[in-house]
Amino acid sequence: MTEENRSTDDEQSTDATDQSAEDVDAPSLSPDELHDRIRRGEAVHLLDVRNRDEVEAWRITGENVEATQVTYAEFAAAKARGEVGEFVADLDLREPVVAVCPRGEVSATVAELLREEGVDARNLDSGMEGWARVYVARELPSEETDATVLQYDRPASGCLAYLVVSGHEAAVIDPLRAFADRYVADAEEFGAELRYAIDTHVHADHVSGVRRLADEEGAQAVLPAGARERGLADALDARLVEDGDEIRVGDATLTALHAPGHTTELTALRLGGDSPSDSILFSGDALFTDSFGRPDLERGDEGARDLAGTLYDTLTEDLLALPDETLVAPGHRTPDAVPNPGENDTFAARLDAVADRLRIPDEKGVFVDRVLESLPPRPANYGEIIPANLGRESLDDETAFEVELEPNNCAVAAMD
């Protein structure tokens, strides 16, 4: 993705201007349509009229996405001077253009100004809030297992979840509260009842849907046993699993695999096939297709070194020691990740390909040092999200949605 920044230091809040923008009826593009274009690899030019800091914190990305950032205040000033034509010409926009703002209001005004100047422009309906509601499901290759597996992708954050269906039973792994109804509906489409709602660990980047699915849909909550040591509230009547425990879903079996490092309690799940090489590994945030989980969210900087060492042991002795053909189904993807055409265009990959990509150093100390040097900024609201996922604090739906509106940042940055 390329991005051009044209904003000045004298910026005006797009939250404020969203409320005062003129009521216009510019042609719009739905967030789902935008996602489909990006997924197909079509060239997309975004004109993002949010402030620079908002764009730098969270933006729409993709392999062929180009973005120009100009504040709405600059457009308003150009209009007041009667110089919109000259201002737009200087932007040198590549058509068609999609205008973006927080809620799709001021960007509608900008799209209309562009169209008045002869630019092929559309407004992103509902803006970034609409983008955060895009949720896409694709089926993972699972012919050798006793289950059908859907991978859910939230492009706005890179969060991935999974629905495992076998016979008339289903389990959802790492569900998001914002989409709890979706898992139930999709299970019903397969003629199954959602029996289990499972978290691989205490999440720091999104509000878990496990509690809602347990309370409102009757699903059995399943969490790693170590979540109790992290302060899991007793009010949640959860089944706690340890290494080697099995969860039966119809004719399929999920086997727990303790995989600490990102957090102390993280427990991956393996869906077995006819042979060990036919399995799917739901790795949570322990292992991604191009990275692995950061070790500093549970115990901060003070405990990060020890957990990084634990992560090294988990990767080298447990996860990467599984059969090469194991399909890694991670808990997140990077914003710029490209779907894997060899795995039904999902964000999954064979374990041998993942191992080749990661190039884990032979020496633990070298690995630990590189991890600690490669930590990106922490998730923006993890201090609110973790207590909510432990059941220690309560967030209403609006607040729960808002605290997730940034990239997940749960992975270690790429290491050279």
Segments the model singles out, each with a brief description of its role:
Residues 168-170, 177-179, 192-195, 263-374, ...:
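Metallo-beta-lactamase
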Residues 107, 198-201, 259, 263, ...:
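Ser/Thr-glycine-rich phosphate-binding loops at phosphate-binding pockets of nucleotides
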Residues 123-141:
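Cysteine-dependent PTP/DSP-like catalytic domain, specifically the C-terminal lobe
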Residues 2-27, 42, 112-117, 313-416:
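Accessory terminal helices/loops
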Residues 51, 140-189, 269-283, 289-290:
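Conserved beta-strand hairpin/beta-sheet module of binuclear metal-dependent hydrolase folds
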Residues 70-72, 81-129:
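Catalytic cysteine-centered active loop of the rhodanese-like fold, especially the PTP/DSP P-loop
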